[in-house]
Amino acid sequence: MTAVLGMSARERERAAEAEALFERRATADLVDRLTDPSWLVRRAVVSALSRLGDEAIEPLIAVLTGDRRSETSIAAAVDALVSSLGHVEEAALRLARSPNTAISCDGAQILGRRRAVSALPELAHLAHSDNDNVALSALEAVGRIGGEPAVDLFIEAVESRSFFRAFPAIDLLGRTGDPRAVRPLAGLLRHPHYALEAVRALGRTGQPGAVPLLAELLTRPSDADVRIAAVSLVEIHDRYAGRFGATSAVPSALRTVDAASVSRRLAHAATDADSGERSAISRVLGWIGGAPAIHALVGLLDADPETARAAAASLASLERSAEPELLRALRTSGSERRLLLLPIVGRRSSATTDVIACLDDPNPNVRALACEALGRIGDASAVPVLFERLGDADARVSQGAVAAIQAMGGTEVERRAVELARTGGARARRPALRILAYFGSVTSLPLFLEGMADPDDRVRDVAANGLAAVDHPRALAALLEASHHGSSRTRATAVRALGQSDATEPVRARLLETLQDPDAWVRYYAVQALSRIGGLASAEPIAGLLHDAAGHVRVAAIDALARLRGDQSLEALHEALGSDDADVVRAALMGLGIVRSASSFPLLGPALHGADAATRLVAVSALAEFDVNEVVDELAKAAFDPSESVRAAAINLLGSRPGPDATRALVGLLGDEGSRDRVAAALTTYVAGRVEGIVAALDREGPETAAILVGVLARMRRPEAQLALEHAFALENVHARRAVAPALSPDITPRGRALLEQGAKSDPDEHVRRLCAAILRG
């Protein structure tokens, strides 16, 4: 039974009754409940009727052909027929042929929502009905089904200029994304009744061939025309980039416009625009470039957050040409605008002075971003002021200053850090020692040794990290001594640092001793350190911590055993799979993925199919590490797991797995509409055998899958994938050639134009010839 959150107790009771009626196959009683006042209950009734299949079809048809007094029951009956598991198409065709307008419209709607390809001829006939409502319903149904007949019908409707058919057909034609849509839509741009809708539809085509038409609108005196043209240009860019991965088509096409006049018109049109329109205008200004565009973009930084972010991104894309205006704005702006400007300031030293001025901004976020920007620039003249910020009251600023100083390096940095570590208070010594620890110079050793005697735990922590970075016997001796310190925090830091040292016998012996330390964090870091330098002899004492009182120690022990490997470690990992502690089980699964022993593979089954989603997720990740034939099948099954996280992981892991089996599995998963986008994204991961596997699939797949696979190859942006597209244009499968044609752009594949010209002249399929011709005209 469909479980719905938010039901009242009475609604849950009625939904349960509907499920009971389904179990009894009580079709008539369920049909009677289509008028239930609760949408949630009707949803349960619709679900039950759809699962009854063929036996519910005629009773539902009777609801639609009866007295039709209840709009509620009519809508519910349509939903039930749309989702029915039965053979609905013939009954829906009878409805569509009805002389009753409302019944005919319901029939067309059902056929469209079920994507009944076999009904296209009848729907095409209805699209020419004398009744505008019937014709519109048929057109919408054809739009849901798609295909070449849909494009032809929409073009015919648009060119009819019959308002009640042409107007809705404009949107439907644009949504086909077909290159042939551009010309008829362009013919409407000067028609007062259709122009604005045609501009929107041109955007929805996602066709670069429409860009010159829209670019002309950017200089019109009407601000509304300019705004809608900008929105449509952005939509073309996003759709084309999303489909084929090519991001230069629209910006390249806009290079021929008069940048100054277009920028002025866009800036003026932005004044009364809404947030989405201003955001689009910002992006178009970024593509156009030039001083007027940059000036307008700086002004848009003060708009709503969405627009400001878009303007900042456009300024960042203009890089060096925008720098003078950016720096001028940085000098004169308040904190809010500086938050947008600082991340996009370039790496040239000419920006140093203006960025340094931001270190005095009252907003700590601005000061932190200024530190980050100075680190990117790398101008050593900023070192003195960055050292002043080490004592900033806000920790983010202090840490940002440390990171910037570390990025610069040099003798001046080391000199200042040494001086501060010697003379500063505890608050100043910590960042100074952290800087010195980053460079790990042996000349800093006395300061680190002195720091280990500091009464402040935090200073000792930083000093211990510095000792770990210095390759000197005195540093190692100090760390060994610190592992006996009275402070558990200092012992833990020292033990962690010992894990970064050479695997000498004194170090290994001391780490083994600290496995028995009374503090859990000391034991934890000891286990981690031994996993790196302990060797197989450490396996047994580490295995003794599998039942430690502290959960994080148990998990660390599992991870360490996996890294140490060996028969004893593997046996301990197998044993840990039976633990009552879910964290230990997950750690053991991760460990088995590290070891990758074929003998462990069958043991993953219970975790892969268990009740706990988090454990299944870890099991799927471990599974992918094994090199056995069954891995691909198990990952494909996990792609239908109830947990969205597990499904996503399984698909992504298939995407990164080389070989034809993984590619075939992913292509098979494209049939699942819910995960289709994620599967397509996974297929774009370039691994051995991926391109070859996609081409093999293109030779046999239908139109929908072929279009997706062509987009995958185009988005790879690799020479092998480009050659594969060109090869696919010669495949016998006409669906592959139809899908490839829109991708044959010089932006995507070098020989694109030549192949389009060849296809327009000699392809055996008329639709391919027309597609190629339309693209070439664009």
Model-derived regions: residue spans:
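Structural detector for internal amphipathic alpha-helices that build alpha-solenoid repeat scaffolds
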Residues: 3-24, 32, 40-54, 62, ...
